[in-house]
Amino acid sequence: GGYYIPQPQFSLHFGYGHPFRIRVRPAMYMGYPRFMYGGFSFILVDPWPEYWANDWYEADDVYVEYDDGYYLHNLRHPGARIAISVVF
């Protein structure tokens, strides 16, 4: 579910080549943690793994990838990805 990011915008701001830090703890929105980046609002559909640091959103570089849905990847933990959704 959710909205889609137009491909030209996605290519400019998202993907492996565009890591970023969320900087603030994701706030609850509609029962899910939400963060903002690149002019878009995202909810974390999956929980983040327990082994991620308590301050991962401040300390870790992450990026958004599309693979039949949007996923948040953490460069410090390359084996894990979190399903996310674009919301307004």
Which residues fall in each region the model found?
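Low-complexity segments
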Residues: 1-88
